[in-house]
Protein backbone atom coordinates (compact mmCIF):
# COMPACT_ATOMS: atom_id res chain seq x y z
CA UNK A 1 0.00 0.00 0.00
CA UNK A 2 0.97 3.62 -0.50
CA UNK A 3 1.30 5.25 2.91
CA UNK A 4 1.67 8.85 4.06
CA UNK A 5 3.22 9.09 7.52
CA UNK A 6 2.64 12.13 9.76
CA UNK A 7 4.47 12.47 13.07
CA UNK A 8 7.06 14.51 14.91
CA UNK A 9 8.77 13.18 18.11
CA UNK A 10 10.63 9.94 18.95
CA UNK A 11 7.32 8.15 19.65
CA UNK A 12 6.42 8.67 15.99
CA UNK A 13 9.92 7.94 14.66
CA UNK A 14 9.80 4.47 16.25
CA UNK A 15 6.64 3.65 14.30
CA UNK A 16 8.01 5.08 11.06
CA UNK A 17 11.21 3.04 11.41
CA UNK A 18 9.09 -0.12 11.67
CA UNK A 19 6.94 0.79 8.66
CA UNK A 20 10.05 1.49 6.57
CA UNK A 21 11.05 -2.17 7.06
CA UNK A 22 7.77 -3.44 5.58
CA UNK A 23 6.93 -3.92 1.90
CA UNK A 24 4.66 -0.85 1.94
CA UNK A 25 5.68 2.27 0.05
CA UNK A 26 6.07 5.34 2.25
CA UNK A 27 5.27 7.96 -0.39
CA UNK A 28 5.58 11.04 1.84
CA UNK A 29 6.33 12.11 5.39
CA UNK A 30 4.69 15.04 7.16
CA UNK A 31 6.29 16.53 10.27
CA UNK A 32 6.34 19.79 12.21
CA UNK A 33 8.57 22.61 10.95
CA UNK A 34 12.17 22.64 12.23
CA UNK A 35 12.41 24.28 15.67
CA UNK A 36 15.16 26.09 17.55
CA UNK A 37 16.64 23.79 20.18
CA UNK A 38 19.58 23.46 22.57
CA UNK A 39 21.84 26.14 23.99
CA UNK A 40 22.79 27.44 20.56
CA UNK A 41 19.12 27.69 19.56
CA UNK A 42 19.94 26.15 16.18
CA UNK A 43 17.10 25.15 13.88
CA UNK A 44 16.71 21.42 14.50
CA UNK A 45 14.65 18.93 12.48
CA UNK A 46 12.20 16.67 14.31
CA UNK A 47 13.23 13.07 15.11
CA UNK A 48 10.91 11.91 12.31
CA UNK A 49 12.59 14.18 9.77
CA UNK A 50 16.06 13.16 10.98
CA UNK A 51 15.14 9.51 10.42
CA UNK A 52 13.62 9.95 6.98
CA UNK A 53 16.48 12.08 5.60
CA UNK A 54 18.38 8.80 5.20
CA UNK A 55 15.74 7.70 2.68
CA UNK A 56 14.70 9.20 -0.64
CA UNK A 57 11.24 10.15 0.65
CA UNK A 58 9.74 13.64 0.27
CA UNK A 59 9.21 15.54 3.53
CA UNK A 60 6.45 18.12 3.94
CA UNK A 61 6.34 20.61 6.82
CA UNK A 62 3.21 22.78 6.49
CA UNK A 63 2.34 25.18 9.30
CA UNK A 64 -1.31 24.08 9.19
CA UNK A 65 -4.09 22.68 6.97
CA UNK A 66 -6.72 25.40 7.46
CA UNK A 67 -8.74 25.74 4.25
CA UNK A 68 -9.56 29.34 5.19
CA UNK A 69 -6.02 30.38 4.17
CA UNK A 70 -4.14 30.04 0.90
CA UNK A 71 -1.27 28.07 2.41
CA UNK A 72 -3.62 25.73 4.28
CA UNK A 73 -5.66 25.01 1.19
CA UNK A 74 -2.47 24.46 -0.82
CA UNK A 75 -1.26 21.98 1.84
CA UNK A 76 -4.56 20.06 1.57
CA UNK A 77 -4.33 19.93 -2.24
CA UNK A 78 -0.68 18.86 -2.10
CA UNK A 79 -1.56 15.96 0.21
CA UNK A 80 -4.52 14.91 -1.93
CA UNK A 81 -2.33 14.83 -5.05
CA UNK A 82 -0.14 12.13 -3.46
CA UNK A 83 -2.89 9.53 -3.93
CA UNK A 84 -2.29 7.61 -0.69
CA UNK A 85 -4.12 4.44 0.32
CA UNK A 86 -3.83 5.33 3.99
CA UNK A 87 -2.24 7.96 6.24
CA UNK A 88 -0.66 6.97 9.55
CA UNK A 89 -0.57 9.69 12.22
CA UNK A 90 1.47 9.53 15.45
CA UNK A 91 1.99 12.56 17.71
CA UNK A 92 2.01 14.87 14.69
CA UNK A 93 0.96 18.00 16.54
CA UNK A 94 -1.18 19.60 13.83
CA UNK A 95 -4.98 19.51 13.67
CA UNK A 96 -6.16 17.62 10.59
CA UNK A 97 -9.50 18.88 9.22
CA UNK A 98 -12.12 16.45 7.94
CA UNK A 99 -11.10 17.18 4.33
CA UNK A 100 -7.63 15.74 5.08
CA UNK A 101 -9.01 12.79 7.07
CA UNK A 102 -11.19 11.86 4.08
CA UNK A 103 -8.43 12.17 1.47
CA UNK A 104 -6.67 8.74 1.62
CA UNK A 105 -8.57 5.69 0.33
CA UNK A 106 -8.82 4.17 3.83
CA UNK A 107 -8.68 7.42 5.77
CA UNK A 108 -6.21 8.27 8.55
CA UNK A 109 -5.11 5.90 11.32
CA UNK A 110 -3.77 7.24 14.61
CA UNK A 111 -1.37 5.56 17.04
CA UNK A 112 -2.46 6.76 20.50
CA UNK A 113 -0.56 6.08 23.72
CA UNK A 114 -3.45 4.98 25.94
CA UNK A 115 -6.39 2.58 26.12
CA UNK A 116 -9.07 4.85 24.69
CA UNK A 117 -11.43 6.37 25.64
CA UNK A 118 -9.33 6.75 28.80
CA UNK A 119 -6.72 9.50 28.46
CA UNK A 120 -7.69 11.29 25.30
CA UNK A 121 -5.46 14.29 24.68
CA UNK A 122 -1.91 15.55 24.90
CA UNK A 123 -0.33 13.76 27.89
CA UNK A 124 -1.75 10.22 28.20
CA UNK A 125 1.48 8.61 29.43
CA UNK A 126 2.12 11.17 32.18
CA UNK A 127 -1.49 11.24 33.39
CA UNK A 128 -1.69 7.45 33.59
CA UNK A 129 1.34 7.35 35.91
CA UNK A 130 0.28 10.35 38.02
CA UNK A 131 -3.18 8.87 38.56
CA UNK A 132 -1.81 5.50 39.62
CA UNK A 133 -3.16 3.41 36.73
CA UNK A 134 -1.69 -0.09 36.79
CA UNK A 135 -2.15 -0.60 33.05
CA UNK A 136 -2.11 1.39 29.83
CA UNK A 137 -1.46 0.54 26.21
CA UNK A 138 -1.82 1.54 22.58
CA UNK A 139 -4.98 2.18 20.61
CA UNK A 140 -5.00 2.27 16.82
CA UNK A 141 -8.05 4.26 15.73
CA UNK A 142 -9.56 5.59 12.55
CA UNK A 143 -9.33 9.33 13.01
CA UNK A 144 -12.36 11.59 13.32
CA UNK A 145 -12.49 15.38 13.57
CA UNK A 146 -12.78 15.38 17.40
CA UNK A 147 -9.84 15.03 19.81
CA UNK A 148 -9.03 11.29 19.88
CA UNK A 149 -12.69 10.41 19.30
CA UNK A 150 -12.27 8.01 16.37
CA UNK A 151 -13.43 4.41 16.21
CA UNK A 152 -11.01 1.90 17.79
CA UNK A 153 -9.47 -0.79 15.58
CA UNK A 154 -6.74 -2.46 17.62
CA UNK A 155 -5.39 -2.39 21.19
CA UNK A 156 -2.28 -3.63 22.96
CA UNK A 157 -1.80 -3.66 26.73
CA UNK A 158 1.15 -2.58 28.87
CA UNK A 159 1.48 -2.85 32.68
CA UNK A 160 2.69 0.23 34.56
CA UNK A 161 5.22 -0.72 37.24
CA UNK A 162 6.07 1.17 40.43
CA UNK A 163 9.44 2.05 38.86
CA UNK A 164 8.11 3.36 35.55
CA UNK A 165 8.77 6.99 34.67
CA UNK A 166 7.19 8.73 31.70
CA UNK A 167 10.50 8.15 29.90
CA UNK A 168 10.53 4.36 30.40
CA UNK A 169 6.80 3.97 29.72
CA UNK A 170 7.11 6.13 26.60
CA UNK A 171 9.74 3.78 25.18
CA UNK A 172 7.63 0.69 25.93
CA UNK A 173 4.56 2.23 24.30
CA UNK A 174 6.52 3.53 21.30
CA UNK A 175 7.67 -0.04 20.61
CA UNK A 176 4.14 -1.37 21.09
CA UNK A 177 2.74 1.31 18.80
CA UNK A 178 5.17 0.35 16.05
CA UNK A 179 4.24 -3.33 16.35
CA UNK A 180 0.52 -2.52 16.46
CA UNK A 181 0.43 -0.35 13.33
CA UNK A 182 2.42 -2.95 11.39
CA UNK A 183 -0.10 -5.61 12.49
CA UNK A 184 -3.07 -3.53 11.34
CA UNK A 185 -1.35 -2.79 8.01
CA UNK A 186 -0.04 -6.33 7.45
CA UNK A 187 -1.97 -6.38 4.18
CA UNK A 188 -4.81 -4.49 2.52
CA UNK A 189 -7.15 -7.35 3.46
CA UNK A 190 -6.03 -7.14 7.11
CA UNK A 191 -6.67 -3.39 7.16
CA UNK A 192 -10.13 -3.91 5.65
CA UNK A 193 -10.88 -6.51 8.35
CA UNK A 194 -9.91 -4.18 11.22
CA UNK A 195 -11.87 -1.30 9.65
CA UNK A 196 -14.96 -3.50 9.34
CA UNK A 197 -14.69 -4.59 12.99
CA UNK A 198 -13.90 -1.17 14.46
CA UNK A 199 -15.53 -0.22 17.75
CA UNK A 200 -17.16 3.09 18.70
CA UNK A 201 -15.72 4.69 21.86
CA UNK A 202 -17.95 4.75 24.95
CA UNK A 203 -18.21 8.47 25.71
CA UNK A 204 -19.19 7.76 29.34
CA UNK A 205 -15.70 6.33 29.96
CA UNK A 206 -13.84 9.34 28.55
CA UNK A 207 -11.02 10.83 30.64
CA UNK A 208 -8.90 13.72 29.32
CA UNK A 209 -5.12 13.86 29.61
CA UNK A 210 -4.60 17.60 29.81
CA UNK A 211 -1.32 19.10 28.66
CA UNK A 212 1.39 19.35 31.33
CA UNK A 213 2.34 22.73 32.74
CA UNK A 214 5.59 23.37 34.62
CA UNK A 215 3.90 24.73 37.74
CA UNK A 216 2.17 21.43 38.56
CA UNK A 217 5.56 19.72 38.87
CA UNK A 218 6.25 21.59 42.13
CA UNK A 219 6.19 19.02 44.93
CA UNK A 220 3.32 19.43 47.38
CA UNK A 221 4.41 17.86 50.66
CA UNK A 222 0.82 17.77 51.97
CA UNK A 223 0.12 14.95 49.49
CA UNK A 224 0.80 11.41 50.69
CA UNK A 225 4.11 9.80 49.70
CA UNK A 226 2.56 7.48 47.11
CA UNK A 227 1.10 10.45 45.20
CA UNK A 228 4.34 12.46 45.47
CA UNK A 229 6.28 9.47 44.09
CA UNK A 230 3.80 9.06 41.22
CA UNK A 231 4.15 12.72 40.31
CA UNK A 232 7.96 12.55 40.37
CA UNK A 233 7.84 9.57 37.99
CA UNK A 234 5.15 11.17 35.79
CA UNK A 235 7.13 14.41 35.37
CA UNK A 236 10.38 12.63 34.39
CA UNK A 237 11.78 13.61 31.84
CA UNK A 238 9.64 16.79 31.59
CA UNK A 239 8.94 19.15 33.26
CA UNK A 240 10.77 17.40 36.18
CA UNK A 241 9.41 17.57 39.73
CA UNK A 242 11.00 20.33 41.80
CA UNK A 243 11.29 21.88 45.26
CA UNK A 244 11.22 25.69 45.21
CA UNK A 245 14.06 26.39 47.65
CA UNK A 246 13.72 30.17 47.31
CA UNK A 247 12.48 32.71 44.78
CA UNK A 248 15.29 32.02 42.30
CA UNK A 249 16.40 28.45 42.99
CA UNK A 250 14.62 25.16 42.43
CA UNK A 251 15.94 21.72 43.37
CA UNK A 252 14.92 19.21 40.70
CA UNK A 253 13.93 15.72 41.83
CA UNK A 254 14.50 12.97 39.26
CA UNK A 255 13.90 9.77 41.22
CA UNK A 256 12.35 8.63 44.48
CA UNK A 257 11.06 5.60 46.36
CA UNK A 258 8.66 5.14 49.26
CA UNK A 259 10.73 5.50 52.45
CA UNK A 260 11.18 2.77 55.07
CA UNK A 261 11.87 5.48 57.70
CA UNK A 262 9.30 7.24 59.85
CA UNK A 263 9.00 9.83 62.60
CA UNK A 264 5.89 10.23 64.72
CA UNK A 265 5.59 14.03 64.86
CA UNK A 266 7.25 15.01 61.57
CA UNK A 267 5.91 18.03 59.70
CA UNK A 268 5.13 17.81 55.99
CA UNK A 269 8.34 18.63 54.08
CA UNK A 270 10.62 17.83 57.04
CA UNK A 271 13.83 15.92 56.28
CA UNK A 272 13.87 13.09 58.85
CA UNK A 273 17.01 11.27 57.64
CA UNK A 274 19.79 11.38 55.05
CA UNK A 275 21.54 8.08 54.39
CA UNK A 276 22.91 5.87 51.61
CA UNK A 277 19.38 5.40 50.26
CA UNK A 278 18.72 9.12 49.86
CA UNK A 279 16.90 12.00 51.54
CA UNK A 280 13.89 10.88 53.59
CA UNK A 281 11.11 13.49 53.73
CA UNK A 282 7.79 13.55 55.57
CA UNK A 283 4.67 13.86 53.42
CA UNK A 284 0.95 14.10 54.17
CA UNK A 285 -1.00 11.46 56.12
CA UNK A 286 2.14 10.57 58.12
CA UNK A 287 3.81 8.98 55.08
CA UNK A 288 7.44 9.30 54.00
CA UNK A 289 9.32 9.46 50.70
CA UNK A 290 12.99 8.95 49.88
CA UNK A 291 14.51 11.25 47.25
CA UNK A 292 17.19 9.21 45.47
CA UNK A 293 18.34 11.60 42.72
CA UNK A 294 18.25 15.40 42.80
CA UNK A 295 19.81 18.24 40.82
CA UNK A 296 20.77 21.70 42.09
CA UNK A 297 20.61 24.67 39.67
CA UNK A 298 23.59 24.67 37.32
CA UNK A 299 24.73 21.23 38.45
CA UNK A 300 24.25 17.66 37.31
CA UNK A 301 21.90 15.07 38.74
CA UNK A 302 23.31 13.48 41.91
CA UNK A 303 22.69 10.03 43.36
CA UNK A 304 22.03 9.32 47.05
CA UNK A 305 25.71 9.04 48.02
CA UNK A 306 26.61 12.29 46.24
CA UNK A 307 23.66 14.11 47.85
CA UNK A 308 24.95 13.24 51.32
CA UNK A 309 28.46 14.40 50.41
CA UNK A 310 27.26 17.89 49.37
CA UNK A 311 25.94 18.55 52.90
CA UNK A 312 23.54 21.09 51.34
CA UNK A 313 20.54 19.44 53.00
CA UNK A 314 20.26 18.57 56.69
CA UNK A 315 18.03 16.55 59.01
CA UNK A 316 15.32 18.72 60.55
CA UNK A 317 15.21 21.09 57.56
CA UNK A 318 11.68 21.86 56.33
CA UNK A 319 11.51 21.82 52.55
CA UNK A 320 9.11 24.42 51.11
UniProtKB/Swiss-Prot annotation:
<dbReference type="InterPro" id="IPR002376">
    <property type="entry name" value="Formyl_transf_N"/>
</dbReference>
<dbReference type="Pfam" id="PF00551">
    <property type="entry name" value="Formyl_trans_N"/>
</dbReference>
<dbReference type="InterPro" id="IPR036477">
    <property type="entry name" value="Formyl_transf_N_sf"/>
</dbReference>
<dbReference type="GO" id="GO:0004479">
    <property type="term" value="F:methionyl-tRNA formyltransferase activity"/>
</dbReference>
<dbReference type="GO" id="GO:0005829">
    <property type="term" value="C:cytosol"/>
</dbReference>
<keyword id="KW-0808">Transferase</keyword>
<protein>
    <recommendedName>
        <fullName>Methionyl-tRNA formyltransferase</fullName>
        <ecNumber>2.1.2.9</ecNumber>
    </recommendedName>
</protein>
<dbReference type="InterPro" id="IPR041711">
    <property type="entry name" value="Met-tRNA-FMT_N"/>
</dbReference>
<dbReference type="InterPro" id="IPR005793">
    <property type="entry name" value="Formyl_trans_C"/>
</dbReference>
<keyword id="KW-0648">Protein biosynthesis</keyword>
<dbReference type="InterPro" id="IPR005794">
    <property type="entry name" value="Fmt"/>
</dbReference>
<feature type="binding site">
    <location>
        <begin position="114"/>
        <end position="117"/>
    </location>
    <ligand>
        <name>(6S)-5,6,7,8-tetrahydrofolate</name>
    </ligand>
</feature>
<dbReference type="InterPro" id="IPR037022">
    <property type="entry name" value="Formyl_trans_C_sf"/>
</dbReference>
<comment type="similarity">
    <text>Belongs to the Fmt family.</text>
</comment>
<dbReference type="Pfam" id="PF02911">
    <property type="entry name" value="Formyl_trans_C"/>
</dbReference>
<dbReference type="InterPro" id="IPR044135">
    <property type="entry name" value="Met-tRNA-FMT_C"/>
</dbReference>
<dbReference type="InterPro" id="IPR011034">
    <property type="entry name" value="Formyl_transferase-like_C_sf"/>
</dbReference>
<comment type="function">
    <text>Attaches a formyl group to the free amino group of methionyl-tRNA(fMet). The formyl group appears to play a dual role in the initiator identity of N-formylmethionyl-tRNA by promoting its recognition by IF2 and preventing the misappropriation of this tRNA by the elongation apparatus.</text>
</comment>
Amino acid sequence: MKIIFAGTPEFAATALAALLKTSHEIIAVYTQPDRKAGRGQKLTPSPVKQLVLEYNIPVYQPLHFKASTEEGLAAQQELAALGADVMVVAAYGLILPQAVLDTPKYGCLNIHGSLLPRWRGAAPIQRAIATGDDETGITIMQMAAGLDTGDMMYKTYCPITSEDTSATLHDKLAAQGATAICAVLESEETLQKYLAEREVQDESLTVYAHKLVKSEARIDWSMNAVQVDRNIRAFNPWPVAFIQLDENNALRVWYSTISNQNKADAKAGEIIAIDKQGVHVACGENTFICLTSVQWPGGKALNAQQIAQTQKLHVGQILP
